[in-house]
């Protein structure tokens, strides 16, 4: 079951909370919620910049533990600084990082920003983290599976080497969803206290000829 911002029921399993209001990211603190997804619209300047990055053959990979207060977000991807929309992109990454830090009272975060031309994690899984922010800036978004329609015994080695579609993990194919581009996703992991058995089940999407690359931002609790 998926709930909207207008309708929230506490079930015996975890739910996804869907909204278009950034303030609703705080719903991730609800014990019954393991995914919080906020859809948003971005301006054309930002989307054109992202489109250029995805068309460029050179890969992008930025992985660093940063202190939010001192990190220079306008130093991200300096080789693209001449492109229209660069500052809008940097401001957006900074804004998402600020939201994440404020929500969880963090001073440091692990920031990852990279282009992908393959499914990095092609099988459904649960991350061994407290809570991860995921935003696909361009390309196909991360897929997630509703908790009520997952047989968690089939995760990992429980799949017997079979694909998600054949292992019995997915109890209803209609319960598999894709995060829209630019949506802000919060995924509770297995390290969230009290949520150890209900971490958000998700996977990388299969890419297509029409959309062969994606630009992914993730934020994690810093050390």
Regions picked out by a protein language model, each given a short descriptive name:
Residues 1-80, 87-91:
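N-terminal auxiliary "cap/dimerization" subdomain that precedes the catalytic jelly-roll/cupin core
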Residues 118-181:
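Catalytic core of non-heme Fe(II) oxygenases with the double-stranded beta-helix
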Residues 46-47, 144-146, 188, 195-196:
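Short helix/loop capping segments that flank catalytic or ligand/cofactor-binding pockets
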Residues 113-115, 137-151, 201-204, 216-223:
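Active-site environment of non-heme Fe oxygenases that use a 2-His-1-carboxylate facial triad
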Residues 32-35, 130-133, 182, 213-214:
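Short, surface-exposed beta-edge/turn micro-motifs
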Residues 36-39, 108-114, 135, 186-187, ...:
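A structural signal for short, well-ordered beta-strand segments and their strand-loop junctions
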């Amino acid at each position: 079951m998926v709930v909207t911002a207008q309708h929230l029921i506490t079930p015996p399993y975890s739910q996804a909370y869907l909204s278009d209001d950034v303030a609703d990211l705080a719903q991730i603190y609800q014990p019954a919620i393991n995914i919080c997804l906020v859809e948003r619209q971005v301006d054309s300047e930002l989307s054109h910049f992202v489109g250029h990055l995805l068309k460029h053959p050179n890969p992008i990979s930025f992985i660093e533990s940063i202190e939010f207060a001192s990190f220079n977000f306008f130093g991200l991807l300096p080789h693209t600084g001449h492109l229209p929309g660069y500052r809008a992109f940097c401001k957006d990454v900074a804004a998402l990082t600020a939201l994440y830090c404020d929500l969880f009272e963090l001073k440091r975060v692990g920031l990852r920003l990279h282009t992908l031309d393959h499914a990095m994690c092609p099988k459904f899984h649960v991350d061994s983290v407290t809570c991860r922010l995921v935003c696909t800036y361009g390309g196909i978004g991360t897929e997630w599976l509703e908790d009520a329609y997952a047989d968690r015994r089939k995760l990992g080695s429980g799949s017997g080497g079979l694909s998600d579609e054949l292992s019995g993990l997915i109890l209803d194919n209609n319960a598999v969803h894709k995060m829209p581009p630019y949506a802000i996703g919060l995924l509770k992991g297995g390290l969230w206290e009290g949520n150890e058995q209900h971490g958000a089940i998700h996977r990388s999407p299969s890419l297509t000829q029409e959309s062969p690359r994606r630009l992914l931002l993730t934020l994690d609790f810093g050390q």
